[in-house]
C-alpha cells in the first residue's frame, strides 16, 4: 500500500491567492503584459518617461479604480486593490512604486482626508491620470532621510508652475 502524500495544487494556489483571488489574478495578467515589463539598460530619463506611459496603460486596463468610491467609478474594494497592485512589482518595481504614489498616496490622501468637494473636484482627474501626483520623500544623490529633505517646491501663481530646487547634486 502506498502512503505517498499528495498535494492539491489548485487548493494551495487558491489559499495563497487569498480572499481577493480574482483581483490578484487580474494584477498578474496585467503584470505579464510586455508593455509593463522592465526594459534593461534604459537611462533614468527614459525609464521615468516609460513609467509615466505605463501608468496611462494601467488606467486603460481598468486597473486603478478599485479603491475609489462607486459614485466616482470605483468599486470601494481596498483589499482587492492592494492584492492586484502587489503583482506589479514582478513587471517593473518602478511601476509599482509610481502607481502607489499616484493612487495609493496622492489619491488616497484626497479620498481619506478631503471632503466631498475635494472628491468631486480632484478624484476623477487623479483616477484618470489627468492630474498626476507626487510624494516627496527621497532625493537623487541624497537618499530617503525624510527628516532631512532639502528639496523645496514653490508654486508660482503667475505661471501656474511649481519650481523645484534641490541643494543635492544627483
Region spans (language model):
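DPxDG-like acidic metal-binding loop motif
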Residues: 166-170
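Hydrophobic/aromatic beta-strand elements that line small-molecule binding cavities or substrate pockets
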Residues: 150-154
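Short acidic, glycine/serine/threonine-rich loops at helix termini
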Residues: 145-149
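Cytosolic ligand/metal-binding cores
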Residues: 138
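Amphipathic, small/basic residue-rich leader segments at the start of a protein or domain
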Residues: 1-134, 143-144, 155-163
